Amino acid sequence: MELLLLLLSTLLILTLCCHFFYLFIRTNKQNGSEKLPLPPGHVSWPFKYFETLDYLKKARTNTIHKFIAERVQKYKTKCFKTCHIGQNMVFLTSAEGNKFLFSNDYKLVRSWWPVTFLKVFENAGEEITVEEVIRARKQFLSFFNEPDALARHVAITDQVVQDHFKCYWDGSKQVGVYPLARKLTFDVSCRLLADIQDREILDESLPLMGNVVRAFFAFPINFPGTILNRAIKSSRRLRKIFVDIIKERRGDLLEKKNLDQRNDVLSRLLVENYKEGRDIDDVFLAKNLVSLLSAAYDNPSVTITSIVKNLAERPEIYEKVRKEQIEIAKSKAPGEHMSMEDVKKMKFSMNVLSESLRLEAPASGTFREALDDFNYEGFLIPKGWKVHWSVHATHRNPEYFSNPETFDPSRFERNDPIVPYSYVPFGGGHHICPGKDYAKLQILLFMHHVVRKFKWEKVNPDEQLIRAPNLFAPKGLPVRLYPYAYEN
């Protein structure tokens, strides 16, 4: 009995000591945080209204880097606070800031997206989190990360690209590059993710997906006629289309129609779960296919448009790309598809792609949410505040890139090392774009065929890409085509 009382007393004392120690640490932490100032900037009325207007104004001229540079110059700091997409937000403005943020995923910060992004993918009466979306995407794309997975998809992608040119470019005197690029990248994404080849389904789904993507940064107002309302309806229709495809694919699996010989993500996922006796809800699969497709097709189409624009404006660079691609084509037999080895030879073309991404990255960056108060560069980042890393902070910054406004693909072949975390078109850390190699693949294959088939000029010489908030061509970038004799 005495021993039991002694043990209970000891346990009580230890519990009290732990409790007081916790209170001491928490109090010191809070006091330390309170001593730190917030980053400089404006988040209160009426200043945040003018901050938002200034950001939007510069986005419309694709000069967000000036919005950031002006505040860096004004505050003399590597971060500042502002109001962005309705949130108190801290912008990190250096390569060191990018590294800090990418290195602290799930430690100090977690991924965050505007509420409209999540609402688009919700079912009625259902709520989802950013983490659920990211986890599902990684599960789906795990098949893309298998050894030699990229090489297996080169021939398929090459065939889709060739079919696209035959249908929409060959025989045309003028084309709108941006809408056709979106059609191409959507076709490629649907083929690789779900082996969708039915033209009727593809043509119905593409404008629906456009509605979905446009709503990611829209005002969170869900009334008939609003951008968000159209996106939610479009997302539901897309889910219905994909549920029907999934049911058909399950039927093929049960009838042993060689589904395990397909390389698309959906078929591989169904076969794997069937073999292991697991079942996945069709609506869950369809919802995540919509989410994946929204990420997979939009950004590559913008980069294709950017490259076509830049090559039209710089004939000497166009000629170097064409010369490289003609040399690669000479090694191929008639009708032979491109291979991974061919793609690896596209070194100058890859430099052009990289430089286009530096100057005209499709997305400005992504967001994190502070999991707790933390100190960055002597400033307090409060729990719940949003933190933004942006390509515009470093991609056009002379501290990291000489002559940053000049389109110079050779900067990626020189021996000058690029400062780590200064070139981040695909993000970094746990949330680096999982499909980046596939995006590069389809863009390079597009370049291979377009420069061998055509020379072109812009119909509107002054047309440039703008942001609202992501990059796009406001007039579609129409170009006049001057075809070459072409042998496949």
UniProtKB/Swiss-Prot annotation:
Protein topology in the membrane: Single-pass membrane protein
Tell me what this protein is called.
Cytochrome P450 family 716 subfamily AD polypeptide 2
Indicate the enzyme's highest-level EC class.
Answer: oxidoreductase
Q: Which organism is it from?
A: Citrus sinensis
Q: Does this UniProt record's set of keywords contain Calcium? A: no
Write out the annotated subcellular location. Answer: Membrane
What transmembrane ranges does the database entry give? 5-25
Q: In which tissues is it expressed?
A: Expressed in maturing fruits and in juice vesicles.
Q: Which CDD domains does this UniProt record tie to the protein?
A: CYP90-like (cd11043)
Q: Which cofactor does it need?
A: heme
Extract the PANTHER family matched here. BETA-AMYRIN 28-OXIDASE (PTHR24286:SF381), CYTOCHROME P450 26 (PTHR24286)
Reactions mediated catalytically: (1R,2R,3S,8R,10R,11R,15S,16S)-3-(acetyloxy)-15-[(4R)-4-[(2S)-3,3-dimethyloxiran-2-yl]-1,4-dihydroxybutan-2-yl]-2,7,7,11,16-pentamethyl-5-oxo-6-oxatetracyclo[9.7.0.0(2,8).0(12,16)]octadec-12-en-10-yl acetate + reduced [NADPH--hemoprotein reductase] + O2 = (1R,2R,3S,8R,10R,11R,15S,16S)-3-(acetyloxy)-15-(1-hydroxy-4-oxobutan-2-yl)-2,7,7,11,16-pentamethyl-5-oxo-6-oxatetracyclo[9.7.0.0(2,8).0(12,16)]octadec-12-en-10-yl acetate + 2-methylpropanoate + oxidized [NADPH--hemoprotein reductase] + H2O + 2 H(+)
Q: Which InterPro entries match?
A: Cyt_P450, Cyt_P450_CS, Cyt_P450_E_grp-I, Cyt_P450_sf
